[in-house]
Amino acid sequence: MDSSLTGITTTGTPHLGNYVGAIKPAIKLSKKFKSYLFLADYHSLIKVNDPIAVKESSMKIAATWLACGLDSKNSLFYRQSKVPQILELNWILSCMAPKGLLNRAHAYKAAVDLNKENKNDDDYGISHGLFSYPVLMSADILMFNPKYVPVGKDQKQHLEITRDIADKFNKTYKIFFQLPEPIIDESLDLLIGTDGRKTVSYTHLTLPTTSC
């Protein structure tokens, strides 16, 4: 049976971007495929250093997913930090990932460009976590070897990096990972906000569980 995988980073209150880009597609796919859904609490450490805030965000996002119709009987729903094998795989994949590939990651390039604009050293304030974020995302995905991964256009590059790393692993050792295919909803470019206006950036539009 084919499978899909979706995760949400636990950095705050769920917003409309989470709903249209992750929660809604994941629930839809769970009716067709074996689904892996997770709370990406390790990823949140790049932006949030408060463990209480991460825990509260995890609870809110989990509650929102359930309130929006997630059937845990048809899906494996888990917290990233509760699967230690992900970090083990993260190290293995980091040995497969060329630095040049990670240099081209959008988040890292944006941080470098901002430093240049502010006349700072290129890597000023940039953590290794931010730089290697795509490798951990690759480990998240390849740990469960799904066929499909719903992604927004801004995350498509990370899935391409995952495919590149998986392909290199397969060629170095043996064919072990299938190359995950993206599911991209082209309609997500614009969303009608709660104020009735079209918006491209909707991460500030929070989503109470009663809205689902």
Residue ranges and their predicted role:
Residues 203-209:
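Conserved small/polar residues in nucleotide/adenosyl-binding loops
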Residues 1-197:
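NTP-dependent nucleotidyl-transfer catalytic core
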